[in-house]
Design a protein with these regions (language model features):
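A conserved hydrophobic secondary-structure block that centers on an alpha-helix together
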Residues: 7-9, 19, 26-29, 124-128
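A short acidic (Asp/Glu
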Residues: 10-12, 49-52, 219-222, 374
Length: 485
């Protein structure tokens, strides 16, 4: 995997090998007792992610179906994401029947902003941008080492696991504690975390949980149950408590605040199919943040709910979805005094899809309404077409969007290269287009090419600051070649 962001030097400066980012790896599976061997750049996920997960985390909609059934172990890092991966070697071995042991070692350079007074790390950067002289100075100017492992026992639908790791930096982490929300950020040079996870799965029920701690002495725990009442009704409940004192630099799990820290919450979901052609999905999520967050100088709360209905017959389906979300954010009164304001966001989506072996068609409409002091409104209409024949697949999409500002932005999903999710955020007025072609030459050789672009009607410039592009229609290109042997 090779990646180049707009504005980054190509075969110039520090990029003497051309691309700013490359991700070499080798992944071997099922080699005798060795279930997985990862060399180069790889990812790891164990338990429910409270200790170690630099792979992905479930969204709230996906939790209705996937809770308790997420994958675990070591994976190749084959995405364009430049911040979340390990570099070195990792292996999973079946030592005895039903007992797997995983060990991993990693050392890599990281991007960081450095405090000039004591040469410590103020912030670890994960954007991967190296476009200006300042950003180049922050490129790989610190290092991180990780050593850890996992023990996993499984039998008759039950499993129990223990995960632990230690990480260290060549420079200590000293975040800017003059900012209230950073008072609970990790501080120091060496950190460790350990956790235990459990699960029981049967045909109708899955129960999962994990509890973790670390050198901060804070506690994090998450517990879930997915119960299939009958063939037509499934219920999901997730409880989470992440102390504001807890942190793990390698964690990622189910959360509202995008962090396994400073959050308590309850999620309730249901999936109901009263008749064969009709399915209803619902979830409600309440979250509480005891410590001030970014852009919120006091305790805050969030409420999020979504309702959707899908009607399907043969190769046709129609889905209607409504989502309501409210949360707190700092505002200022006429005297410049801060207070917590309440923000409300509504999102509506309607899709009509035809999907068979040869043809894929989808028409989609989106509406977004954001309210703080005043309303911000946006909408989008989109058409996708896909053709699948023999070993070739081709997909195109065309969308027109019009929003008042970034707050009422809309999202569209585009098929892209493997391991790379593409959900561009669209705002202002314009047209988004994309085309993707995939060719499977054999069971071992596959190639994907994607071209996408956004034509802005309301502006001659895309983005702002260092990300500003003086064109109405920037183009992005993705190429991927995979050879398995």
């Amino acid at each position: 995997m090779m990646s180049q962001d707009a504005g980054e030097p190509f075969f110039a400066g520090k990029n003497k090998w051309g691309y700013d980012y490359m991700s070499p790896y080798m992944l071997i599976k099922d080699l005798g007792k060795v279930k997985t061997l990862a060399i180069g750049r790889y990812k790891a996920r164990f338990g429910m992610g409270l200790v170690m997960n630099n792979s992905f985390s479930m969204g709230k909609q996906a939790s209705l179906a996937s809770i308790g059934r997420v994958s675990r172990g070591l994976y190749a890092h084959a995405s364009r994401q430049e911040g979340n991966y390990m570099q070195g070697i990792g292996a999973t071995v079946e030592t005895i029947h039903n007992l797997d042991v995983t060990g991993f070692l990693s050392y890599r350079k990281i991007d960081a902003t450095i405090n000039s007074d004591d040469n410590s790390i103020s912030t670890i950067l994960k954007t991967g941008y190296h476009r200006s002289a300042t950003e180049m100075l922050r490129r790989r100017n610190a290092s991180q080492a990780i050593m850890g492992g996992n023990v996993y026992y499984h039998v008759n639908g039950f499993h129990f696991g223990i995960t632990g790791y230690q990480t260290s930096f060549d420079k200590p982490l000293h975040p800017d504690t003059t900012k209230l929300y950073k008072l609970i950020a990790p501080w120091g040079k060496r950190f460790w975390n350990i956790g235990a996870d459990y699960a029981y799965m049967s045909r109708r029920i899955s129960i999962n949980g994990e509890v973790a701690t670390g050198n901060s002495k804070g506690i994090a725990t998450i517990n879930s149950i997915n119960y299939m009442v009958n063939s037509n009704l499934t219920l999901v409940a997730i409880q989470r408590f992440y102390s504001y004192k807890y942190y793990s630099l390698m964690a990622s799990s189910f959360s509202e605040g995008r962090s396994v820290q400073n959050e308590s919450g309850v999620y309730l979901g249901a999936k109901w199919q009263p008749i064969y052609q009709l399915t209803f999905s619902h979830y409600f999520d309440w979250a509480y943040f005891p410590w001030p967050k970014y852009l919120a100088t006091a305790t805050t709360r969030t409420f999020d709910m979504q309702h959707s209905a899908t009607w399907s017959k043969n190769t046709w389906s129609i889905t209607a979805r409504y989502r309501l979300k409210t949360w707190n954010k700092d505002s200022k009164d006429d005297n410049d005094n801060k207070f917590l304001d309440r923000i409300t966001q509504h999102r509506i989506r309607l899709t009509i899809t035809k999907d068979n072996k040869l043809l894929f068609l989808r028409t989609q409409g989106d509406i977004s309404l954001y309210h703080k002091d005043e309303n911000s409104f946006g909408y989008m209409v989109m058409q996708q077409v896909g053709i699948r024949k023999n070993k070739m697949q081709a997909y195109t999409s065309l969308a027109y969007f019009n929003t008042d500002d970034y707050n009422s932005r809309v999202y569209t999903y585009e098929r892209s290269t493997l391991y790379n999710l593409s959900f561009p955020a669209l705002y202002g007025e314009g047209i988004r287009f994309a085309a993707t072609i995939r060719a499977d030459f054999s069971s071992n050789l596959m190639a994907i090419a994607k071209v996408g672009g956004t034509h802005r009607i309301d502006n001659n410039k895309i983005g702002s600051g260092l990300q500003a592009i003086d064109t109405k229609t920037p183009i992005d290109v993705d190429l991927q070649l995979r050879w398995k042997f």
